Amino acid sequence: MALASGPAMRALAGSARLGLGGYGAPKRGAYEWGVRSTRKPEPRPLDRVYEIPGLEPITYEGKKHFVPWLAKPIFPPWERGWIDPRFHRAAPIHEQPLYKEQPCYIFHQRCRLLEGMKQALWLTKTKLIEGLPKKVLSLVDDPTNHIENQEQRVLDIISHSRLWHSTEDIPKRETYCPLIVDNLLQLCKSQIIKHPSLARRTSAQNCSLATTWNRESLLLQVRGTSSTMLSAKDPLPPIASREEVEATRSHVLETFYPISPTIDLQECHVYEVKEDTGFREGYPYPHPHTLYILEKANLRPQRFLPEQLRAKMLLFAFANALAQARLLYGNTARVLEQPIVVQSVGTDGRVFQFLVLQLNTTDLTSSEGVKNLVWTDSDQLLYQHFWCRPVIKKKVVVEPVGPVDFQPETFKKFLALYLHGAV
């Protein structure tokens, strides 16, 4: 191994004195390598104009160019003279024309109530009854209301919605959920030959809705659009008798203290108190019959739980009934002589929720007195699972393509709610 010569050793030693570590490499400490090398430069100090009482600052506004020893002028905000939606600036909340001191708690399409049905019952002053009304169940059990070759036609609808309609291998929920409801409604409409009074109905989509009411010291509002609403020329007949309605006076609404009843509702100070049924005056089908609320979110975190979906169904059915009651009987809070009945069906394309609401009173401020009534039939499976591809094990088809564990009773209830009021 050759030894370094004298001049070479002196050069290496000289590099050490220069801070190169003795071998030509830069010498830095850990602090210099770690923090200082990644630290961003300090931001430029803000241009500040110091206002001294009695003295006017001398700026370079009249010079039309920057002068370093003169103060920076303060220019008024530039006005375009026209509204550009890309750069629109809303006025402060307290300066807007619809601003009000009293907050309004709003329920809309994407509100998910923490307490679910229990919270919705308190907000709407409603008594819950499990199961569908006897009048509706009698339509379910009556074989004369069944459709010819009913089960096979429902199976074809499921296969069409989940498999045949889409070009995807596995269609998403937002694709098959609305399709299966529309096809089931189309199948129900085939009964118009047997029951001509079904011709006095029509369906509408994306109907706007807004209604406001006071509950104790709270101002509540439901507003939004409904997926599909079936409306009719004639209202649904009352379900509960006058004696059953008067018996609700003794019912005590369940509370959920210490949780606030307005939790998960949107608190808003800019709002408009109005009643909107979604239909113009003179519309030939003014009475709401059935709301079809779809849960078609693909991502699981965005989906409603079954309890939250039933609460949403109750609030939107209640809002439609309340808006209709005020349209017919005025805004005076009182017990209705002719209760208003509105139905609702909620589904994710597989599990169905059925609900029937009877609005008995518009006096909702106090928890005493007559209560409204709601009947629910929860978590009714139309089918357990749908195989979009066959399951093959050892070259044997274990599970063929199609629905698994089909429940025909669920469609019978769906059909009974559709026929209610026409049979």
Curated annotation (Swiss-Prot):
It is found in: Mitochondrion. Keywords: Mitochondrion, Ribonucleoprotein, Ribosomal protein, Transit peptide. The keyword Mitochondrion applies. One of its GO terms (molecular function) is structural constituent of ribosome. Residues 1-29 form a transit peptide. Belongs to the mitochondrion-specific ribosomal protein mL37 family. This is Large ribosomal subunit protein mL37. The lineage of its organism: Eukaryota, Metazoa, Chordata, Craniata, Vertebrata. The gene is Mrpl37.
